[in-house]
From Swiss-Prot:
PROSITE patterns: 2FE2S_FER_2 (PS51085), FAD_FR (PS51384). Its main location: membrane. Binds 1 [2Fe-2S] cluster. NQR complex catalyzes the reduction of ubiquinone-1 to ubiquinol by two successive reactions, coupled with the transport of Na(+) ions from the cytoplasm to the periplasm. The first step is catalyzed by NqrF, which accepts electrons from NADH and reduces ubiquinone-1 to ubisemiquinone by a one-electron transfer pathway. Pfam families: FAD_binding_6, Fer2, NAD_binding_1. It catalyses: a ubiquinone + n Na(+)(in) + NADH + H(+) = a ubiquinol + n Na(+)(out) + NAD(+). Residues 32-126 form the 2Fe-2S ferredoxin-type domain. Residues 129-269 form the FAD-binding FR-type domain. This is Na(+)-translocating NADH-quinone reductase subunit F. The gene is nqrF.
Amino acid sequence: MEITLGIAMFTVIVLALAVLILFAKSKLVNSGDITIEINDDPGKAINLPAGGKLLGALANKGIFVSSACGGGGSCGQCIVKVTEGGGDILPTELSHISKREAKEGYRLSCQVNVKNSMKIELPEEVFGVKKWECTVISNDNKATFIKELKLQIPEGEEVPFRAGGYIQIEAEPHTVHYKDFDIPKEYHEDWDKFDLWRYTSKVDEHIIRAYSMASYPEEKGIIMLNVRIATPPPRNPDVPPGQMSSYIWSLKEGDKVTISGPFGEFFAKETDNEMVFIGGGAGMAPMRSHIFDQLKRLKSKRKMSFWYGARSKREMFYVEDFDMLQAENDNFVWHVALSDPLPEDDWDGYTGFIHNVLYENYLKNHEAPEDCEYYMCGPPVMNAAVIKMLKDLGVEDENILLDDFGG
C-alpha cells in the first residue's frame, strides 16, 4: 500500500512539474510566428516562426549579415541595430559593442534570440549579398603554408565586389587528413620537420569563415583567395588545426564550394594622396586586389608603393605580376624584405622585418609621412609593429587602414 501511494505521489509531482514547465514556456517563449520589421520599410519585413538567433533567422530569409566566425560571437562583425524587441544585451556582446553603442540599440545578431516581433536596422548593402555555388578551378601552393584557391562563379552570375572586399565560405561537417594534401616537394621541408602530415581536422557542424579576395573586379567570373593553413603551433602541437583552412586546403579541381558576399569595408579612399601598401603572409590577398584595381582598372596616377615581408624566397609569390606592374607604371614601385633568407637564396635585397625596412629605407626621410594613406594586412605581430611605427611618425588613425583577415 505504501509503495503504491509513493508511486502515485511521485507521478503527481512529475505531472505537476511538467505542467508548470509547459506553462512557463508558453509565457516566456513565443512559439508562433513573429515579424521582423527592417529599416521601417514594409517591403523588407519578414515573417517567420519564433526561435533561434537573429543572424540565422535573417539568413534563412536570404538576408546575409557578415559573420566571419559563423555565429560564434567572437568576430564581432554581425552588428545590427535593434530598435524594438530583442531583449537585453548579453555580456558576450559587450567585448565588441561599447556602452554608447549598446544604448543606441546595437547588438550582435548571432546573440539575439528571436522570441518576439522586433524592429531592426540594417545597412542597405546587406541586401546586395547573395550566395553562390562555385566550382574549384585550381588550388595551388604559392608558399609553404599558403594556397591560392581559384573559384569559378556560375555562368551568367557576377559577384559585385570592390577591391579590398571579402567573401564568406561555408563547409558542411567533414574530416580532413593532412597526409592527403597535394603539396609540391619544394614546400615539404617544414611539413617534414614538424611532421604536419600527422594531423586530422574533424568538424561535426556547419561552419562559415571570411576570406579577403586576391582578385580584383575586372577579373570577371572568378574569385581568388590566398589561404594560410592554421597548423598547430610547434610549441603547442596538441591544439586542433584550423577548421576552415584545413577544409580549403583539401579542395580539388571540380569540387563545389558555397560562398556568400560581397562584404567589406577595407576600401581605398578616393583621394590623390600617396598610397603605401604593407603586407605579409596571406595578407598578400587584399594588397593584390587593391594594387591591381588602382593600376589596371582605374589607371590611377597616384604615387604608390608596396612593401611585402616574407621569410625566404620560397615564400615570395606573384613576383612576376608586381614586376610587370612596376615596369608598366612609373608611379608604382614594390619591395620585398626577407626576415630569414636561406643560403641558397643568394639574396641581395632588403632583409629584416618589413616595418623596419619601410622606415629605414623610405619613411625615415619622407617629407610628409603623415599625409600618406597606409593600407596593411598581415600577421598580427606585423600589423601591431607597423601601426606603432606610423603612430610614432604622427600618422592619424584616419590614414591607417587595416584588414584583419590576412596573415
